[in-house]
């Protein structure tokens, strides 16, 4: 490590080694490791009065393209109001030690990640972004104001970023790429490594994801948000009783009339109401809805089937035959790197 520091550091960009060999076993994990590094970065930026400084979250087994820092600096300079941004990523599909079984497994898991975000955007949710801990950046002042990284052993990135994204003006950096390891792992209960390991243990590259009809149901609700703001409390029930059955059942359990009325009372205009509504119906609540509907109304689909349905919903699918999962992932990657414009309007 010391040799690496001697070789990596250069004028204007020193490299520091932080050693914490005695982490408490109960807390030791990726969340605590990420928190230690990001807390130290925030403290250094605070000491030189740079709250707008950038903290980048990365993983030791990932690698980046040479233009990463340049793209980060350019993006944050051009968007002074952005609190943070996700960086475009791809899992390595070839390379030393990556067999066909791992390749087929990671294709499906990455396709699942991209499908979920893009389906949520199709539904109209404003907080739909990738939230991988290995590929995001946040301003130091925002990091501190949101309480810093948590100590979760898995999902720490998702929970932290879904405190930042609702602040508004969250961004995406697609002019570079962070390349992620597809290795199987049993260190965490979910995530890339756990997903690959699960498929390898099952003996087949098969990954089930949420049925696309559940996102169509959400779209029916989210499309009505402006109408909910304009309506009187007495008519809210009529509006949501015209929605799909899975949505009606879920909203009935959540006292939806009272929620909408509270959002309306505390909103000066439609934009304010919309922000309040989606802070309530945040991505955590979306996942709760999806899990509930797949207990009663829908069965999960193999991810390639769901992804194809999403692509075909607007008539933009460019191949005249049934694609492989790898072909679908290539199309999703291409669309995502162009800023989500080529498939989802």
Residue spans for each PLM region:
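Acidic donor-binding segment of Leloir-type glycosyltransferases
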Residues: 1-26
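Acidic donor-binding/catalytic loop of UDP-sugar-dependent glycosyltransferases
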Residues: 48-53, 57-75
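Conserved donor NDP-sugar-binding/catalytic core segment of glycosyltransferases
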Residues: 66-106
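A recurrent flexible, glycine/aromatic-enriched loop bordering the glycosyltransferase active site
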Residues: 117-137
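Catalytic donor-sugar/metal-binding loop of nucleotide-sugar-dependent glycosyltransferases
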Residues: 152, 164-179
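Acidic donor-binding loop at a coil-to-helix junction in glycosyltransferase catalytic cores
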Residues: 152-159
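Active-site donor/metal-binding and catalytic loop motifs
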Residues: 173-194
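Terminal low-complexity segments of carbohydrate-biosynthetic enzymes
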Residues: 198-345
């Amino acid at each position: 490590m010391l040799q690496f520091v001697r070789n990596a550091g250069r004028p204007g960009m020193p490299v520091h080694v932080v050693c914490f060999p005695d982490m408490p076993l109960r807390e030791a994990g990726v969340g605590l490791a990420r928190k230690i590094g990001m807390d130290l970065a925030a403290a250094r930026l605070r000491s030189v009065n740079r709250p707008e400084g950038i903290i980048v979250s990365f993983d030791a087994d990932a690698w980046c393209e040479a233009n990463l820092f340049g793209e980060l600096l350019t993006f944050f300079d051009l968007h002074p109001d952005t609190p943070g941004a996700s960086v475009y990523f791809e899992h390595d599909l070839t390379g030393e030690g990556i067999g066909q079984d791992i390749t087929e497994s990671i294709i499906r898991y990455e396709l699942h990640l991209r499908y979920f975000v893009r389906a949520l955007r199709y539904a109209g949710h404003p907080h739909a972004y990738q939230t991988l801990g290995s590929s995001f950046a946040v301003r130091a002042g925002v990091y501190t104001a949101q309480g810093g990284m948590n100590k979760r052993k898995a999902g720490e990135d998702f929970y932290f970023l879904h405190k930042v994204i609702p602040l508004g003006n969250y961004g995406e950096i697609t002019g570079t790429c962070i390349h992620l390891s597809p290795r199987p792992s049993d260190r965490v209960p979910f995530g890339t490594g756990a997903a690959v390991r699960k498929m390898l243990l099952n003996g087949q590259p098969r990954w089930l994801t949420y049925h696309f009809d559940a996102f169509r149901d959400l779209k029916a609700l989210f499309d009505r948000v402006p109408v909910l703001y304009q309506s009187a409390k007495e008519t809210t029930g009529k509006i949501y009783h015209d929605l799909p059955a899975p949505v009606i059942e879920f909203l009935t359990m959540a006292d939806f009339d009272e929620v909408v009325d509270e959002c309306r009372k505390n909103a000066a205009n439609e934009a304010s109401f919309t922000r309040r509504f989606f802070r309530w119906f945040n991505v955590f609540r979306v996942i709760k809805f999806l899990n509930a509907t797949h207990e009663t109304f829908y069965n999960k689909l193999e991810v390639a089937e769901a992804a194809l349905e999403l692509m075909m919903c607007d008539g933009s699918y460019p191949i005249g035959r049934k694609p492989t999962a790898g072909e679908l992932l290539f199309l999703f990657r291409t669309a995502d790197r162009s800023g989500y414009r080529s498939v989802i309007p």
